[in-house]
Amino acid sequence: MAHHRPKPDDRSDNVEKLQDMVQNTIENIEKAEETMQFASPEEREKIAEKNKRREEAIAAMRAEIKDEAAARENGYR
């Protein structure tokens, strides 16, 4: 059995990946809000709850973007 070495940690594009994830999540929120007008009251509540979780995820991703950008500035030390 061959020994596999783990891939080195490549964080060079983490900021860009996180920014894409934030943008995609914002688009998902907007699409969900558009569908709310056609949803039942129960579905509206579920959509609102999911969008709240999405907003929380965006806040966490933005904090991670700041951390990754700072790490990039410091040479990932």
Swiss-Prot record:
InterPro entries: SASP_thioredoxin-like. Keywords: Sporulation. GO terms for biological process: asexual sporulation; sporulation resulting in formation of a cellular spore. The keyword RNA-binding does not apply. Induction: Expressed only in the forespore compartment of sporulating cells. It is found in: Spore core. Its main location: other. It comes from the Bacteria. Belongs to the Tlp family. This is Small, acid-soluble spore protein Tlp. The lineage of its organism: Bacteria, Bacillati, Bacillota, Bacilli, Bacillales. The gene is tlp.
